[in-house]
């Protein structure tokens, strides 16, 4: 089967095309039925395209994502990103004769997105229906106006092309994309598992009994980890998004510290002055707003030299990693899981990956670690397609699909 997937939960417009060959039973029998999984055999995923249009430069001037600005950009980007994605997948076929569309249903779908209606109408008039079996789309959680843009685009395509829709949970997609390149497909070796989802909008610990069976056991009570990176960076005068900026400067600080035998001699060094909020609480929840405030107090009245900023960045990053690592390992032990699964934009952080790897290699408690490729940690259409491939029995009629900004796994 071929899945066309759409992602617009925040500020990235992502569209991917994924070919998935049926999973056959371990004994070489008939394909596994929809909704069933044979982890002894790996499904054959073939990426036909994965196109992402980023809005980072647009939102840099605001120091963060403005939902209505992001929505406007999605309306501009969806049609051209779809065309590019289908072209890369070799599924784009121009019509020999352009047929003008006069369809009230399509216009009704886009009644709140007139610009997207204009672009979509032109697209449908100009190109043939692609040879895809399903349209998958993120319907939550995320920024509501952004979600609706992607959902309505998918609804219009589904209606006009008569292709069924598979709604996808954005958080579940961050989890399931790990299985695309996973070598071990024995369910007994993978589950139960624990997923740490860390991004600008979410910080959650999710217990996974099996695919489709999730329980959130901990989450942030205020700022998400990625949000803390961004806000700390803003205090330090760094550009949005703050995560990559802090990571780069933290690496410089670490290198400088290694070259300095006595850190006390380094007046700009910040020796564990920043707190690790809730690190030793008896639950699995997080809180990062206090860390952001601590950065504000630490830097107040200080001369923000390059070395000092780099050292604060190192401490901010390490404080966040310390909390994430401690909580995750403790929850993994308490719930007796076999695998830790990382996901979300912050999981692309090299130091976070490094310290998780080291911790799991040195702990007495044996755990598998699944981490997505860095380019699949951030939002993209491919992860939506992968998630949809596990839930093709959950297709819905286009009329019944709606966005849910507060959707839970």
Give the location of each predicted region.
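N-terminal beta-alpha supersecondary unit
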Residues: 2-21, 37-137, 141
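A contiguous, well-structured pocket-lining segment that forms one wall/lid of small-molecule binding clefts
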Residues: 77, 96-126, 248-254, 269-340, ...
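Glycine-rich beta-strand-to-loop/alpha-helix junction loops that act as flexible
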Residues: 139-140, 157, 199, 340-349
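Conserved phosphate-binding/catalytic loops in two-lobed NTP-binding clefts
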Residues: 167-168, 340, 356-357, 365-384
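Glycine-rich phosphate-binding/hydrolytic loop that grips phosphoryl groups
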Residues: 174-176, 372-409
